[in-house]
């Protein structure tokens, strides 16, 4: 075994000296026993980041380095960080180096994969565009997800990003038998804990793997945890031929951790203090998230926008990789309409008649036109009231309010809070329902019947009950 010894510790950066001609390559994982963490052997993983000369390598710690002293022996593993993969990972919470943090013992598997891999070659990639049905009406109608695509989810605190995410994990697991991988990158520990328990209670956990690198972790772990989670997803795609959903919350923290690591390694910062390799770092991660001829990874990434500045280098670089954006709006949440997706701000690359078909495309555009008209009329309504509108505008407003309410939907994962059974709505039923509203077939039905309903049949049933009462 190739052994080295620690020669310098500066915070999270550890320099290790090896024998002549024995230097481990860049990105190799090294093991060291740190008594400051616990009394287990090889409990700290270091990743080689630079070769300094004089047989010394500079490494970044994947955990706290308090307790390390000069002269400690370091083992060269000969590999990058190796992640446990396969069915044994499902239902478990693991950290950046593949060790469990849920207190249920180690992952029981013999299959491991390195976290640093090249993106699939052009010849292996699947270029056909297919739609991934989520069962969430507003997303399937207005922001269709491309299979193997990347969607960004933008929203402030408390508008329901996590609930929408969990519903998608539930629907993919229940309807498609699909697998989900969740990467908590720079997450609040409390949120990660809540998500684990909510998924456990709603029965989704056995079809999902959770990989966490929380805010308390050093930057090395936060800069690598997204790659660790992606490796778990890649195994299901490449070896088992599955369609996998990869959730990353939050992709900004990945960039932020990269900037911290870059500063620790003494690299010259670029604009706004970010790392000079910002585009490369993000590109290496995003290019691995794709469809191949074997299976697909569809990714939903929460994007934090610093100071609401979309021109900040971190979100601006992320935008270049996304196929669409789901914008969650506080104004819509205030109306009590959940999921609080903004139908006019959200966009998808595949909202196109050649992909979705004429019927779906024109229904989606008609819905957006009616909602936009209603938005334009709201100032007049606020000042003069509904009575001053023309008959045509009154009809538009009535339909828009019905559409707005029909875009709400009871979720399976929220059943415990709402007491209303969750609904999965197929794309064709969604399109048919909205088309009928736009055509005026349901102008006589009260708008309250459309609120928190599944398909249009349920609306008609509700309306019957309301008229009978």
Swiss-Prot record:
InterPro entries: AAA+_ATPase, ATP-synt_VA_C, ATP_synth_F1_bsu, ATPase_a/bsu_AS, ATPase_alpha/beta_chains, ATPase_F1/V1/A1_a/bsu_N, ATPase_F1/V1/A1_a/bsu_N_sf, ATPase_F1/V1/A1_a/bsu_nucl-bd. It is found in: Cell inner membrane. Its main location: membrane. Keywords: ATP synthesis, ATP-binding, Cell inner membrane, Cell membrane, CF(1), Hydrogen ion transport, Ion transport, Membrane, Nucleotide-binding, Translocase, Transport. It catalyses: ATP + H2O + 4 H(+)(in) = ADP + phosphate + 5 H(+)(out). It comes from the Bacteria. The keyword Ion transport applies. Gene3D superfamilies: 2.40.10.170, Bovine Mitochondrial F1-atpase, Atp Synthase Beta Chain, Chain D, domain 3, P-loop containing nucleotide triphosphate hydrolases. GO terms for cellular component: plasma membrane; proton-transporting ATP synthase complex. NCBIfam families: atpD. Produces ATP from ADP in the presence of a proton gradient across the membrane. The catalytic sites are hosted primarily by the beta subunits. Belongs to the ATPase alpha/beta chains family. This is ATP synthase subunit beta. It comes from Syntrophobacter fumaroxidans (strain DSM 10017 / MPOB).
């Amino acid at each position: 075994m190739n052994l080295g010894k620690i020669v310098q510790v500066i915070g999270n950066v550890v320099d290790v000296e090896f024998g002549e001609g024995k230097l481990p390559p860049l990105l190799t994982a090294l093991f060291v026993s740190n008594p400051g963490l616990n009394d287990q052997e090889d409990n700290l993983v270091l990743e080689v980041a630079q070769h300094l000369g004089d047989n010394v390598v500079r490494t970044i710690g994947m955990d706290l380095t308090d307790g390390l002293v000069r002269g400690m022996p370091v083992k060269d593993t000969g590999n990058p960080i190796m992640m446990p993969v396969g069915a044994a990972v499902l239902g478990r919470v693991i950290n950046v180096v593949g060790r469990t943090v849920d207190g249920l013992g180690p992952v029981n598997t013999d299959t491991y994969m390195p976290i640093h891999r090249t993106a699939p070659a052009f010849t292996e990639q699947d270029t056909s565009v297919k739609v991934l049905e989520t069962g969430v009406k507003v997303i399937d109608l207005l922001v269709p997800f491309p299979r193997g695509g990347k969607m960004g989810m933008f929203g402030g605190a408390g508008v329901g990003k996590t609930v929408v995410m969990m519903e998608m994990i539930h629907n993919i697991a229940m309807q498609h038998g699909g697998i989900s991988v969740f990467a908590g990158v720079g997450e609040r520990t409390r949120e990660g804990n809540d998500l684990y328990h909510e998924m456990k209670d709603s029965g989704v956990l056995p079809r999902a793997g959770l990989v966490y690198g929380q805010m308390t972790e050093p930057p090395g772990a936060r800069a690598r945890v997204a790659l660790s989670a992606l490796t778990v997803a890649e195994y299901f795609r490449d070896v088992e031929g599955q369609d996998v959903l990869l959730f990353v919350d939050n992709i900004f923290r990945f960039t932020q951790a990269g900037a911290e690591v870059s500063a620790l390694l003494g690299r010259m910062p670029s604009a706004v203090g970010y790392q000079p390799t910002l585009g490369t770092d993000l590109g290496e991660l995003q290019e691995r998230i794709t469809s191949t001829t074997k299976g697909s990874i569809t990714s939903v990434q929460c994007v934090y926008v610093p100071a609401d500045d979309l021109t900040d280098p971190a979100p601006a670089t992320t935008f270049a990789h996304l196929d669409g954006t789901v914008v969650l709006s506080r104004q819509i949440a205030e109306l009590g309409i959940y999921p609080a997706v903004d139908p006019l701000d959200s966009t998808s690359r595949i909202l196109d008649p050649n992909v979705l078909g004429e019927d779906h495309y024109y229904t989606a555009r008609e819905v957006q036109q009616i909602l936009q008209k209603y938005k334009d009329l709201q100032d007049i309504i606020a000042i003069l009231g509904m009575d001053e509108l023309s008959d045509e505008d009154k009809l538009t407003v009535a339909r828009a309010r019905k559409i707005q309410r029909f875009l709400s939907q009871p979720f399976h994962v929220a059943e415990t809070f709402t007491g209303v059974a969750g609904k999965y709505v197929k794309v064709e039923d969604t399109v048919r329902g909205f088309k009928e509203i736009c055509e005026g077939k349901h102008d006589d039905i009260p708008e309250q019947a459309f609120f928190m309903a599944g398909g249009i049949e349920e609306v008609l049933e509700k309306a019957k009950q309301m008229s009978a009462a």
